[in-house]
Amino acid sequence: MVVLLCLCVLLWEEAHGWGFKNGIFHNSIWLEQAAGVYHREARAGRYKLTYAEAKAVCEFEGGRLATYKQLEAARKIGFHVCAAGWMAKGRVGYPIVKPGPNCGFGKTGIIDYGIRLNRSERWDAYCYNPHAKECGGVFTDPKRIFKSPGFPNEYDDNQVCYWHIRLKYGQRIHLSFLDFDLEHDPGCLADYVEIYDSYDDVHGFVGRYCGDELPEDIISTGNVMTLKFLSDASVTAGGFQIKYVTVDPASKSSQAKNTSTTGNKKFLPGRFSHL
């Protein structure tokens, strides 16, 4: 009984720190403005940066490698990335909010690999810059419009931004593209937006989009969705505006049973809750 009571207290304190209310996280501010921490990976993909290269990436953008405390502060307001990265003083780890079997070993908190003796190991980077441009965030509002960095001006080279949308249990997310103009190439290997029907960019891949044709609307299977924007080191374009609204579970659109395209809406089958 005592053990159970202690466990309940710990869970309450953790939930209170994240701002739980009515089954959702209440945080709808840009992570870069709130905590100043963001994730960076090499253009060639994940786990390509040495410690010196990771430092250079952060400093080039006017920041520095995040400390463990800074990464933990960002995690407590919803920063969740399933990728290990360099921190200050040669430390490596990554922030987990939602436990899962394929990310974080079923734990929450900073998954800490410790201070690495071999600074030539290759990981991603966690940078800290409270004055960075708006690039990514965690949204819990019932509806919102968000944009590529600098929109309506062209976005910069070498951007990697993540947006995480989290609504109440049982709700779905209706995603619509209002404007869309990215560098075009046949394989979408240069600049692109990726959409994931999940809490992170590890599971639930929906599609990768580039060029200037508006993608079709997408309705999620559950109450979470992740978007990733990446630009390369050369050509830029006008960027994008994306809108999402809440789909109530009682509405007809949320009752679709199969993946299909109706008009310009793409329905994704599945259960409602990812949290």
UniProtKB/Swiss-Prot annotation:
UniProt domain comment: The Link domain interacts with various extracellular matrix components, including heparin, heparan sulfates, hyaluronan and I-alpha-I complex. It is required for binding to various chemokines. The CUB domain is necessary for calcium ion binding and transesterification reaction. It is required for binding to FN1.
Name the UniProt record assigns to this protein: Tumor necrosis factor-inducible gene 6 protein
Record: glycosylation sites: 118, 258
Compartments reported by the entry: Secreted
One term of GO molecular function: fibronectin binding
Description of the deletion phenotype: Mutant female mice are infertile due to impaired cumulus oophorus expansion upon gonadotropin surge. Mutant mice have twice the bone mass of wild-type littermates. They show increased trabecular number and trabecular thickness.
Keyword Hydrolase: yes
Disulfide linkage: 58-127, 82-103, 135-161, 188-210
Function as written in the Swiss-Prot or TrEMBL entry: Major regulator of extracellular matrix organization during tissue remodeling. Catalyzes the transfer of a heavy chain (HC) from inter-alpha-inhibitor (I-alpha-I) complex to hyaluronan. Cleaves the ester bond between the C-terminus of the HC and GalNAc residue of the chondroitin sulfate chain in I-alpha-I complex followed by transesterification of the HC to hyaluronan. In the process, potentiates the antiprotease function of I-alpha-I complex through release of free bikunin.
